[in-house]
């Protein structure tokens, strides 16, 4: 049976479920999660999506992204997928949500209400090769500059939210100081 995604309205109110590929072909708005893991040096862990992924293959992206299953809370889905994709277990905090829509190169449509989580982890990930073919720790200022120079090398959703991610990190540092 095909994986299901949770259909939502613009307020993130659940309105149904649909097959994942059907939702991505039709452009149905559905719930998603994006995880950003930082180390103690405040570097962000990026993953390079596996060449076998059904969309955005071979692109650099945030640490982990996926969809919660029907009846699964976003926080639980985020912890589950972070372990499955990158072999990391850590505390995650939800930071914000945003909606984005993009028509991808293979005519699939990303139309997601994305819940963004931050976590902290020091050490190397153990990526699932079906999900990620490479990884690296990067400075956020470097990433912002590289996204400006080479947007084609990154996932659309990373570009869509990176400025808000950077602003949240600045707020977090200000609160701690």
Swiss-Prot record:
**Which domain of life does the UniProt lineage start with?**
Bacteria
Residue stretches making up the Nudix hydrolase domain: 28-160
Q: What is the reaction catalyzed?
A: isopentenyl diphosphate = dimethylallyl diphosphate
EC assignment: 5.3.3.2
Annotated active site residues, numbered on this chain, are: 65, 112
Tell me if Manganese is a UniProt keyword of this record: yes
List this protein's GO terms for biological process.
dimethylallyl diphosphate biosynthetic process; isopentenyl diphosphate biosynthetic process
Query: Which residues hold Mg(2+)?
Result: 65, 85
Provide the cofactor list for this protein: Mg(2+); Mn(2+)
* Membership in a protein family: Belongs to the IPP isomerase type 1 family.
Q: Could you tell me what this protein does?
A: Catalyzes the 1,3-allylic rearrangement of the homoallylic substrate isopentenyl (IPP) to its highly electrophilic allylic isomer, dimethylallyl diphosphate (DMAPP).
UniProt-recorded name of the protein? Isopentenyl-diphosphate Delta-isomerase 1
Q: Which organism is it from?
A: Aromatoleum aromaticum (strain DSM 19018 / LMG 30748 / EbN1) (Azoarcus sp. (strain EbN1))
């Amino acid at each position: 049976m095909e994986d299901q995604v949770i259909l939502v309205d613009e307020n993130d109110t659940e309105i149904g479920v649909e097959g994942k590929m059907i939702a991505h072909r039709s452009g149905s708005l559905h719930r998603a999660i994006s995880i950003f893991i930082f180390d103690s040096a405040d570097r962000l862990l990026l993953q390079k999506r596996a060449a076998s992924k059904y969309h955005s293959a071979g692109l650099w992206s945030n640490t982990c992204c996926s969809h919660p299953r029907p009846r699964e809370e976003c926080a639980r889905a985020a912890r589950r997928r972070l372990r499955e994709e990158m072999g990391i277990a850590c505390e995650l905090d939800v930071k914000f949500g945003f909606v984005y829509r993009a028509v991808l190169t293979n005519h699939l449509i990303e139309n997601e209400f994305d819940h963004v989580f931050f976590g902290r982890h020091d050490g190397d990930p153990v990526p699932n090769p079906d999900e990620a073919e490479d990884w690296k720790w990067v400075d956020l200022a470097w990433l912002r500059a590289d996204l400006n120079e080479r947007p084609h090398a990154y996932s659309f959703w990373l570009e869509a939210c990176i400025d808000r991610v950077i602003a949240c990190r600045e707020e977090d540092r200000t609160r701690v100081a």
